Amino acid sequence: PSPRYFDKVSDPVITFDLDASFTEAWRNFWGPSINTYAKFSSFVTGTGVVRPKPGEMFLQDPEVLRTELMDDAANLHNTYDDYQFPAHIRTVQVAGWGVPTVKAIKYKKSHGFPGYDTNFTIEGDKTVVYPSAISSVADETYFFDLEKYRKNEDNNTQHRDLLNAGPIQNILTSIIEKENVVENNFILTTKPQATNLNDQLIVSTNSPVILGAYDQLGNFTGIDPNQNLSADILNIKEDIPGSTFMYTNESQYIFLPKEGSYNFIYKGTGNGPTTVEIENFSADVTTPVASYTDIPTTPNTSATFTVESTTPEDTVITLDLNGNGEEEIISADGGSTELSLNQLITLIKEKISTLVIKDKLKQNLLKQISSLEKKIENKKQKNIKILANLGKKISNQEIKGKISTADTVEIA
């Protein structure tokens, strides 16, 4: 954002979680948030509180930008933000509106490590918030109601292809032919109000997984699971009317109309904990509904869950940790049910296999795990025999009439 942006928008673009110790130095220097250009510039260039430039794979760490490039950008804006075209040149600006768009970043801990979360606004085109889109001096300003257009015409329209949309093509035609731009259902001279929009659900994951959802008609929004998930570039779909898919680093967000039910799937792409959150998005305000934290995940993990728009807080997740068909149920009580012993051992084996250690040490650790598995299996068979003998004794007591048939069935 430019200096002009901060003059128009009072909301901070960066906030710091008070409970995250790694933000303490930042909070001491800039305060709990950044809402001025001077603070913003010193943060992104690393000149306020000095920090090293992160490696290219460390996307959770804030980048360090070159000071001279930031200065050049600010000077460009200072020169042209107030530029007025000659009177004989017609100037028209159009802002896309109604699609969830990132408006701020909150630095916080994620699974115990430094990370960040994103704050969204509905007042943008999925890339640019509307104050940036109409920051110039113009004769005419219009708003393209993308919320309505995506729901009724083309759900994939966003910032990158605005010029291809029919309503924008009509505006261009009117300008070229020196005609007036006519308002319609999608092109407005007055900005729509976020309070007039229906509520949405946000379902998000922060983890090494890919997330997707199906509506009741089979339309899909999310990362297409039917592709090579190890590829560098993955195919994303937004086929559910009124839906939006967003992603940052390892976090993925699916915005959905709060109506009907949605069947979700996620697949593991690595080892680590997964957090699933369900939130309500109303008039630009996000409210937590349910959270499922630190769910164990491996590359073989898959999970499914159904979100009912009327009762999203009752959602339960069915998890297959290792892809072996052994499932467990996770409820929104802040965490998972306890892992079975077999699931825990499999998770440990997967983790050992990914360790960057000497091969001899790795094989020795795996051998010890294998020995433990055999001992557990032997103990399991012994317990099965004990339970079988107990069952026979109970049946004998039933035959003798000392235990009722109903009680025997219940015990069995």
Predicted regions: what is each one?
Residues 1-187:
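Helical cap/lid subdomain of alpha/beta-hydrolase-fold lipid enzymes
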Residues 183-412:
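Extracellular glycoprotein-like low-complexity segments
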